[in-house]
Amino acid sequence: MERYENLFAQLNDRREGAFVPFVTLGDPGIEQSLKIIDTLIDAGADALELGVPFSDPLADGPTIQNANLRAFAAGVTPAQCFEMLALIREKHPTIPIGLLMYANLVFNNGIDAFYARCEQVGVDSVLVADVPVEESAPFRQAALRHNIAPIFICPPNADDDLLRQVASYGRGYTYLLSRSGVTGAENRGALPLHHLIEKLKEYHAAPALQGFGISSPEQVSAAVRAGAAGAISGSAIVKIIEKNLASPEQMLAELRSFVSAMKAASRA
């Protein structure tokens, strides 16, 4: 959890926002996935948001569903994902690492055992996409026992009660939805969200990172101007992977230039 605090303090001092890419672990295979993650970090990613392959990702659009399918086709298991996480942490000791999960995968070996394993491999936060705030007690309690930040989604239509709950229960960062629906670069995030960001700050919530439909540098700078602490981009990154499956080196080169441009926009 401290890695997020340190990151946001440093970015604050430099007057810049965070750029956080999302990819699915093991897409399109373990070896290339590790190279992708190294490339994202080298190109300027401030933190990572990583998915563990899941057969029925409800919140995700077709791009990220296909990433899950590619990882499954490569035979990637949750156990291998944790081995990958340990390698990533060993190589990159300071970068915050967040997982985006679905409840079934957390339940699989018991909630506490899941968060204990996260702590062991150096994960900083977990967002369980299909568990609403009001059902989150066993997850967030286990998370805090193991020094893992529980992350909550703040939707664009959040009422005051939900804003207060998200502020009270969340740690690390707050996942601010640009809009409702499923993820995807086609559905571009609609700004501004000033009022939500102001309210979250008023209730002392963890810093807000805006996600869903973030696919251009302009959207990153707009999120930062609206008061968000940064932006998360998933589908746009995964599309670059999908487009270059036949040419791994070209894939890494395109990822590098995309992330560099997105990070540069966080300094605007």
Curated annotation (Swiss-Prot):
GO molecular function terms attached to this record: tryptophan synthase activity
UniProt pathway annotation: Amino-acid biosynthesis; L-tryptophan biosynthesis; L-tryptophan from chorismate: step 5/5
Keyword Magnesium among record annotations: no
Keyword Cell membrane: no
UniProt catalytic activity: (1S,2R)-1-C-(indol-3-yl)glycerol 3-phosphate + L-serine = D-glyceraldehyde 3-phosphate + L-tryptophan + H2O
Alphabetized CDD domains for the sequence: Tryptophan_synthase_alpha (cd04724)
Keywords, ordered alphabetically: Amino-acid biosynthesis, Aromatic amino acid biosynthesis, Lyase, Tryptophan biosynthesis
Record-given protein name: Tryptophan synthase alpha chain
Protein's organism: Salmonella paratyphi B (strain ATCC BAA-1250 / SPB7)
